[in-house]
Swiss-Prot record:
Protein name per its UniProtKB record: Profilin
Function: Binds to actin and affects the structure of the cytoskeleton. At high concentrations, profilin prevents the polymerization of actin, whereas it enhances it at low concentrations. By binding to PIP2, it inhibits the formation of IP3 and DG.
Keyword annotations of the record: Actin-binding, Allergen, Cytoplasm, Cytoskeleton
MF terms in GO: actin monomer binding
SUPFAM superfamilies per the UniProt record, alphabetical: Profilin (actin-binding protein)
Pfam families linked: Profilin (PF00235)
Source organism of the structure: Apium graveolens
GO cellular component: cell cortex; cytoskeleton
Signal peptide from the UniProt entry: none
Chief location of this protein within or outside the cell: cytoplasm
Length: 134
């Protein structure tokens, strides 16, 4: 399966319990910032944004004072899981980022999709990739 198919079929899929609803944007990006695959709606991410996200995985709380930036948009960092998941909130939407051995799995959502629904979609694929050694 191509990386684009993972984004299209497993991240931009219909949200369970919300017929016709999907995440706003999604991507799989290498730890080095290289884009493996992304939805057409995913923002243009900057190298320093990936560097900040990677640093927060290594040093949980690093992004809390400044916020998490994704394509220039600022998200307030909310509870995550050290070295595994970072979650951000912006207005009625937000972002979930799951770290795997080689990549970062991003899911961006807006209402009516809930933070919990986004977490399930992103973390399910991330856990699968970890199980595959990726």
């Amino acid at each position: 399966m191509s990386w684009q198919a993972y984004v299209d079929d497993h991240l931009m899929c219909e949200v369970e319990g919300n017929p016709g609803q999907t995440l706003t944007a999604a991507a799989i990006i290498g730890h080095d910032g290289s884009v493996w695959a992304q939805s057409s709606t995913f923002p243009q991410i900057k190298p320093e944004e990936i560097a900040g996200i990677m640093k927060d995985f290594d040093e949980p709380g690093h992004l809390a004072p400044t916020g998490l930036y994704l394509g220039g948009a600022k998200y307030m960092v909310i509870q995550g899981e050290p070295n595994a998941v970072i979650r951000g909130k912006k207005g009625s939407g937000g972002v979930t980022i799951k770290k795997t051995g080689q990549a970062l799995v991003f899911g961006v959502y807006d209402e009516p999709v809930t933070p919990g629904q986004c977490n399930v979609i992103v973390e399910r694929l991330g856990d699968y990739l970890i199980d595959q050694g990726l």
